[in-house]
Amino acid sequence: MTGRCLIKYSFTPMMTGSQVRRRFLDFFISKGHKEVHSSSLVPANDPTLLFTNAGMNQFKDVFLGVEKRDYNRATTSQKCVRAGGKHNDLENVGFTNRHHTFFEMLGNFSFGDYFKKDAIAYAWELVTSPDWYGMQQDKLYATIFKGENGVPRDDEAYQLWLDVGVPKERVFEMGMKDNFWAMGDTGPCGPCSELHYDMGVASSDKKNPECAAGECKFPCECGRYVEIWNLVFMQFDRDASGTLNPLPKPSIDTGAGLERVTAVMQGVVSNYDTDLFTPLIKRAAELTDVDEKREEAKESQSKSAASLRVIADHSRAATFLISDGVIPANEGRGYVLRKIIRRGIRHGRLLGQNKPFLHDMVYAVRDLMQDAYPELKETADRVAKTVLAEETRFANTLDIGLKKLDEDLASLAETTRELGRLSWEEPKPVEFALKEVARHVFVVAQMLSPGMTFDTPGHGFLLRRGIYRAWMDLKAVGLDRVVRLSEIAEALSEGETGRVQSVAKNLAHTKQILDAEQERLQSASSQLEFELDAMEAEKKLAENPEMLAEQVREVFGPALEEKVINELRGKLQSRPVYSGDKAFKLYDTFGLPLDFMVDAARDQGIEFDQAGFDAAMESQRETARASWKGGSKLSASPIYRELAEELGTKPYPGQLAGGHPMITPQSIFVGYTSTEFKGATVLAIISNGASVAQLAPGDVAEMVLDYTPFYSESGGQIGDTGWLYDSTGNTVVAEVETVQSPVQGVRAHKVTARQNIAVGDKLNAVVNADVRRATMRNHTGTHLLHAALREVLGKHVKQAGSLVDPAKLRFDFSHFTGVADEELQDIEDIVNKEVLKNDRVEVIENVPIDVAVNEYKAMALFGEKYGDRVRVIKIGDFSTELCGGTHTLATGEIGLIKVLHEGSVSSGVRRLEAVTGENSVRHFRKDHELEGVVSTIVRPSEGLSPAQALKFELDRREEEIKKLRKELEQSRMKSASSAVSSATESAREVKGIKVLATRADNIDRNQMRTLIDNLRSKLGSGVIVLGSVQDGKVALIVGVTKDLTSKIQAGKIIAQVAKHVGGSGGGRPDMAEAGGKDPAALDGALNATYGIVDSLLS
């Protein structure tokens, strides 16, 4: 099957993806549905979801009965992401035809209005009518719930499908796994029906000859039969005991994947071959310099084709996630976004594109999807800059991660160097290779016995070729750095035959040649092929190597073979393992791909701890889940939802337009215009997650009142504090610490009781007015700052979070670089001019959301959930936002706004902190006091403010300190160099090699390396071990001159020396480093060096 498989259907001409989306919405509008715009990918006020992953998410509270809309039929095309948590399609994306991280879910919904009959009739009409989709009826299959686990079969749906015209042989029964839906362990649930389309050909690996021949039957899972629509019939309410109780108003929730429906309408097997993706794949091919047409002619599962699909998909997900306010981070949603971006970058690298490119894909996504999602026109530049920043960051961290991986693997390989790629569980290929090594070494030893060299005509080629083949066979099993060829020659020399004895007589010369050539091969392996090609010309002079091979076989007895194999096998007993935890840190921190690390470890013969990696990954996922599930807010435990249902509903005092009351639990906020309410009734008391009847003095609990002036924490503004008085208003019965809304409409007051309080008591609620006023100043100031930031920095600035309390305001916003001091000054000047204008802060209640956004041009705040009607805060012509918080009556009440700090929160997100009112005055008073102190330290310079004069003096002194520090380091280096150089005279000879072990304290590693190089030059040939103590830590460096690395390696020396100071280390044969924890043991470690070298040489 080729990459693009076309199937000719009768419904032509081909419908575009945009037309498929629009036609779905128009069909349901014609059936009395309201078109509702897609909600954000960041679920509002739903801690159970990482991302919006279904069309019904934005209607969840409507289905649960805690929210009322002014329509009971809706249709949407909902943006969805499944790349984390329960629904995680990330690893499959690009390698299958229908997995995506970002997708659109077409849906129609009924909130207690029509039910199964109309839902099934609508679905069938839309997909089969020539006026709409016009799919071939004989290609469609329906499924129903067959009945399972005590839940009856959905006979009604079965009959309804027959009634609309589906033959009974194409209506199939499925179990609870496929055809029963539930919102959770308890709550709304019900059977569902699916529509599947026969694509005519299999499209997955799960196929047999019947599938390949197109003879398989529904519901074969080979990919031939594609689910295009799921109709959920919410007709039950499952209680805690598992009993299914009929819902008084059954509802409908359907979902049809736009990408799948479009594939059917365009006659292609793969979603990636639809016009929803092909422009993106084409752009990805251009940016990665891949011949996309050539790849299309190949198998669709080719690596290049898969990588292009990954880039196309991930660019969609990244564009929409960032557009909706998600920023790359190391936890929660930001972490998933970072993984998506980095996976896209990695697949670009697999295609040979190592430069930033993914940010360019953002504009391709915008051009393709801006008609359906016009917000992309405004956000594209911001999104592209965020992706580019992440690409740059990833490139930097990748280099650091690769270096760290090399260090980790080198440290492991120092103990047992590069163990075999072939496992000892497969002895035959390993033993065969080892025997070949021994055979080649024996042949070389025989040739060297008469004094032959590499310069000997003809035979010189055979000699070098024989060593090369021995080395390559050794390398094939990963032992080229474990075993010396000279060791094998020595083992071969211990035999009884005359030929073996002849090898023994010339063993020293043989070992010297083998060591030198192996060292050359190790260090210059990249040039080998060139060198060997140059030697091909000498082949005609060579003697027949087969003759020597026959002689080897005559004398190569089983005992000797076994001896060599056993010797090598003994070196393989402790196979090193690369820690999965370490690998995950590189994956998580530096973005190193898992398969890259596995391959790198395997290439060096090191086992990879996959189980440890998986455990670390799962631990991180748990942390990520926790990071987005909640914070300081009260958990929405079942008690609050039960309370909302128990309390019933009550019309809000200000009814909505058209006479529709806002249905909400009996917990009404009346604090916009007053900070007191007399006669509030205690509706419920919650203590430790359970409902209680009363509180005693000192008890801490949450209390729900029917009417309250206390603002509940929302939109970044903290909850009010204050007091609850008895009905006389004279006695405080409880202190209110904060107020939160665990479920919509229920305002839970966290209180500490001073008197006995019982459910049903009448109390007077009084907000701390001073704290409220300070909070209001900061909240209105936040709106002014938001508008000023957009004016100074650009319209890409959007709120990314906020905190408003009485002491200060904190505002997080999208921006890519630090805000310059001059820009901060401009922002501060602009907002204070608005304060001085004393403009009225206009509050406009119950505005239809579309009017607020399109006519008032109100800005919606990040992460907030809005209903059909909203509250607009308008400050002159300067700022208009959707906001439910409390505000000053006019800007003049703010007094003064002072910006305290601006800094980075994460990539692409900045944070600004400021104070208003009395706190601004306090800040200026502190500044004035500081200026007085500065004037006593720094002599004021002409034209400089005290702050500027202080900065000038600090900069001057910092430069002076840097100069003195440099002079001190140079002095230390000079002193250490002099002392160490004089110590060369005390170098000892160990088995004919000069060895110097000395210390030079209070110098850094770079200086130590310089000393090592100087000492090696001075000694000419030898081993140097240098130790140093600085800041209570031991540093060790070993240097071996090049001429000695075949006999003794720096890494082996340092491994043993470091043990004496409680450390470890590794490195190259000529240079190795280590650290240690025991400074007192350094002298002993250096003294032990000579014995260690002697032992290693033995």
Curated annotation (Swiss-Prot):
Name its species. Koribacter versatilis (strain Ellin345)
Give a Gene Ontology cellular component term annotated to this protein: cytosol
- This chain belongs to which protein, by name? Alanine--tRNA ligase
How is the cofactor bound, as the UniProt entry phrases it? Binds 1 zinc ion per subunit.
The record lists the catalysed reaction(s) as: tRNA(Ala) + L-alanine + ATP = L-alanyl-tRNA(Ala) + AMP + diphosphate
Q: Which cofactor does it need?
A: Zn(2+)
Q: Write out the domain note.
A: Consists of three domains; the N-terminal catalytic domain, the editing domain and the C-terminal C-Ala domain. The editing domain removes incorrectly charged amino acids, while the C-Ala domain, along with tRNA(Ala), serves as a bridge to cooperatively bring together the editing and aminoacylation centers thus stimulating deacylation of misacylated tRNAs.
Where does this protein hold Zn(2+)?
779, 783, 883, 887
The record's listing under Gene3D superfamilies reads:
2.40.30.130, 3.10.310.40, 3.30.54.20, Bira Bifunctional Protein, Domain 2, Threonyl-trna Synthetase, Chain A, domain 2
Which molecular-function annotations from GO does this UniProt entry contain? alanine-tRNA ligase activity; aminoacyl-tRNA deacylase activity; ATP binding; tRNA binding; zinc ion binding
- Write the Enzyme Commission number(s) for this entry: 6.1.1.7
Q: Where in the cell is it found?
A: Cytoplasm
